[in-house]
């Protein structure tokens, strides 16, 4: 494929992926990674490419959510610090830990949380207080799994916090804003392992420069739109959308894991 073709294709991928992530608080990494892998990009290149692109898209997304008052500063600070620590640690061990070993547990957890979200939204009285207990450990876990598996910050953190009864708009905005700092930590660590030669299978990431640029440009275009979208959509609609998205992602990953896809 030509450089221009790669840029245009992944520009569209970045636009769609960032809109999903900005509006629902998850799935940029999973969406972008799926297209990169399908295009024949090696897993190591895919993870690093997505995190490089997210340097820019998460900054734009976080700024958009902040401008629409979708961010709780206390929650943002806790998630940013904890997620960055967990993400950096995960990036440092990703060359020695097989992500496939923990993937079945992640899939099961996501499916469970998807059911919990739908149950809370459709069957119970909404609890609109933002969760404060256990946020730091959750952020560390989300950052760690995001680095290990190439995605997972949004599905793990957003899903868990909404599942506890938090207001989706504020949860999604705060988690998206914190993701910039998590991505910065993960991306920096991944690049360091590639440059120093510790990640033997990474190869020359510059081969994917056009795809990375496309992901960045597409994401920057859609970030403000998604930030506005989440600020006006009713809580029940947003919560149901998140729950269904989580179940869909879990089902897709389970099918891929068992060889059905």
For the regions a language model picked out, list residue spans one by one.
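Transmembrane alpha-helices of multi-pass small-molecule transport proteins
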Residues: 49-64
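Hydrophobic alpha-helical segments of secondary membrane carriers
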Residues: 49-53, 174-178, 245
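Hydrophobic alpha-helical transmembrane segments in multi-pass membrane proteins
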Residues: 53, 57, 182-187
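Juxtamembrane transmembrane-helix boundary motif
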Residues: 1-23, 27-39, 43-44, 63-151, ...
């Amino acid at each position: 494929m030509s450089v221009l073709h790669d840029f245009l294709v992944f520009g569209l991928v970045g636009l769609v992926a960032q809109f999903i992530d900005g509006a629902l608080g998850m799935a940029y990494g999973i969406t972008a990674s799926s297209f990169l892998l399908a295009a024949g990009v090696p897993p190591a290149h895919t993870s690093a490419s997505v995190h490089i692109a997210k340097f820019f898209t998460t900054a734009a997304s976080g700024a958009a959510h902040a401008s629409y008052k979708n961010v709780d500063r206390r929650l943002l600070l806790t998630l940013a610090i904890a997620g960055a620590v967990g993400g950096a640690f995960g990036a440092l061990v990703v060359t020695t830990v097989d992500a496939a070993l923990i993937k079945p547990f992640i899939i099961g957890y996501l499916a469970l949380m998807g059911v919990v979200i739908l149950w809370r939204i459709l069957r119970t009285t909404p609890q609109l207080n933002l969760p404060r207990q256990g946020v730091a450990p959750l952020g560390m876990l989300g950052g760690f799994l995001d680095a290990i598996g190439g995605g997972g910050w949004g599905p793990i953190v957003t899903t868990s916090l909404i599942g506890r009864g938090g207001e989706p708009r504020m949860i999604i905005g705060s988690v998206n804003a914190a993701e910039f700092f998590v991505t910065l930590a993960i991306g920096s660590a991944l690049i360091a392992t590639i440059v120093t030669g510790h990640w033997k299978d990474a190869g020359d990431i510059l081969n994917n420069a056009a795809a990375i640029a496309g992901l960045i440009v597409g994401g920057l275009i859609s970030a403000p739109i998604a930030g506005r979208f989440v600020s006006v959509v009713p809580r029940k609609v947003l919560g149901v959308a998140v729950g269904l998205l989580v179940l869909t992602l879990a089902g897709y990953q389970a099918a891929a894991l068992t060889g059905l896809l």
